[in-house]
From Swiss-Prot:
InterPro entries for this protein: G-protein_beta_WD-40_rep, Quino_amine_DH_bsu, Utp13_C, WD40/YVTN_repeat-like_dom_sf, WD40_repeat_CS, WD40_repeat_dom_sf, WD40_rpt
Pfam family, one: Utp13
Protein name: Transducin beta-like protein 3
The gene coding this protein: TBL3
Phosphoserine found at: 257
Amino acid sequence: MAETAAGVGRFKTNYAVERKIEPFYKGGKAQLDQTGQHLFCVCGTRVNILEVASGAVLRSLEQEDQEDITAFDLSPDNEVLVTASRALLLAQWAWQEGSVTRLWKAIHTAPVATMAFDPTSTLLATGGCDGAVRVWDIVRHYGTHHFRGSPGVVHLVAFHPDPTRLLLFSSATDAAIRVWSLQDRSCLAVLTAHYSAVTSLAFSADGHTMLSSGRDKICIIWDLQSCQATRTVPVFESVEAAVLLPEEPVSQLGVKSPGLYFLTAGDQGTLRVWEAASGQCVYTQAQPPGPGQELTHCTLAHTAGVVLTATADHNLLLYEARSLRLQKQFAGYSEEVLDVRFLGPEDSHVVVASNSPCLKVFELQTSACQILHGHTDIVLALDVFRKGWLFASCAKDQSVRIWRMNKAGQVMCVAQGSGHTHSVGTVCCSRLKESFLVTGSQDCTVKLWPLPKALLSKNTAPDNGPILLQAQTTQRCHDKDINSVAIAPNDKLLATGSQDRTAKLWALPQCQLLGVFSGHRRGLWCVQFSPMDQVLATASADGTIKLWALQDFSCLKTFEGHDASVLKVAFVSRGTQLLSSGSDGLVKLWTIKNNECVRTLDAHEDKVWGLHCSRLDDHALTGASDSRVILWKDVTEAEQAEEQARQEEQVVRQQELDNLLHEKRYLRALGLAISLDRPHTVLTVIQAIRRDPEACEKLEATMLRLRRDQKEALLRFCVTWNTNSRHCHEAQAVLGVLLRREAPEELLAYEGVRAALEALLPYTERHFQRLSRTLQAAAFLDFLWHNMKLPVPAAAPTPWETHKGALP
């Protein structure tokens, strides 16, 4: 009973979003500024500006038309950013302030596909999908040149690095490179040697040599004085970008003699250095490529000495230029987040499994990202061991892997196991100590994997690769896919949930069947043991959550509230409450004792596949198909403290208001009553003020001293008062003061003024008509009073006259 009472006192009532990990790069161009401190990348309708040091998005720039950004470029002086949208508008930004300094039509008849600044940051060239190339003077704000002749989409433009030569290069879908003279306004030459799309152009320091790369798996060296190809270098991969390296020896990259060397990035996913004179590859990046690691973009920031690459998985990688040593990793887009877990003994990191073979580890404090390679197919599930240093992952490649994070936050794969014949969809780690893990697969079996003793040593570093795991127990558990497995807090029981609509309880380590939980109408997505009681929670595609007794396998409670499948469930508040997530994008907080849904959290836009709670039970983590990972903070205590402070303040102010009313200090009481949001008290105060002979002047003087928000509140009160004929006079008095003393522009700026006026008009007309009829009736009565003449009464006859009239 004492434990129950303590648990009730710790009931949670609300969570608030503390942080979001959202997409910031969805492919296309990415660019560093000259200092290497800021990274610019496209994400739909926005250009995001990242701080390289922290990985945080400093600012998002979005054009007024809210159309997708098709191209952008940053000037060499780092001052001006120009963006182009599908609405055929160009926007010039002062990006450091986040403001648009100029907006103009691109004049292209189709969206702008590429753009580039000249070395002086004065001219901007744009290439469109209409085959046209235009040149703009950014300083004087006019178009200078319009070049036609390119068939199809112009996807590449570049100025010659020598501004005195006034040359512009472009390439379209015909794989030719056109050289345009800005001085003669003509095409000087057409360079034809590529057989597929040209992807990049680079120029030597003296400006006499140009390097071009293409998807035809060759790079070509051009002599710009003769406009002839001097050498063709086969690189044996589709090249997306080629960069000329500085002409200085770099032994780490195989650059030992003077000459022209260039760096290529392509579909093999590795950076390679080539000697132009011999056509030989002198350096190949040691990092082995993996699925989705094809390089789609590469640039060199000479001043910062950094190479930036982008992968097909929308990851941005920064390398030190002289050694190609990896410096930074940024996960631009996680696609569909399938599972999330806190990582580290203090939950300092987050590991995310998305629709990719790679895992992403984020440090919550600094936003630093680490991308983990190892699986060869999509990772489906994660789980963390008790101490937080080790975690497990399973994937569609039919394998399970164990990863270790060191104290520096670096993660490496230390063990792997295989044996399932289909995708491994769920994994659970032992709870008491780091001794084993259990996996469930689409082959309808579960496997128990004991951890080797060598794996438990923190100093163990597998020099020869990950340790191989051997399954100790394999058991066929269900007739359909196993979606979830859970290990009891004492490591002696195993629960499995399947698409066959049942959950089963097994004894570990032999996997002996103890009982079956039946009652759901559709397949089960999640099973979870209570940390305090002998209870199992199951979440199903039928939209319900059920609690089951482990002793007799009976259903104790059913929670209904989700409109779609319930994908995850977790116990919080020492087993007295539940957190659940569903395919409707909602996260719900339930109190078990009364089956009540305490709070519904709506921050995701799609299926919430991942749900995990922190060790201290003060944070929750969710991941969804909308590519968002959200960190939730328990704000129950903060809200309760805030509510208590607010109530105490209300009591003090209410007492002050009562004192003012008792002392008949109505003018001060009016503002206080408005602040307390007491319409009836405000009405009483105004009625008291209007009983004074000088009511109009006092009411007007008091209202003029009110703040704008108080006047807005008073106007809202008037709407309610005006609906009652007994209080309409006070409402009209207040409205009259506002209309007489406030300028129309100020009144229209009030919050909700239009709705208030619409509500006031019909009742005001009705009151006016009623008062007009009353006034007419009063005038008619006054008229009758003044014009009414009463007849003079006749005098009564005397007794003698009466007697005389009776004689004959």
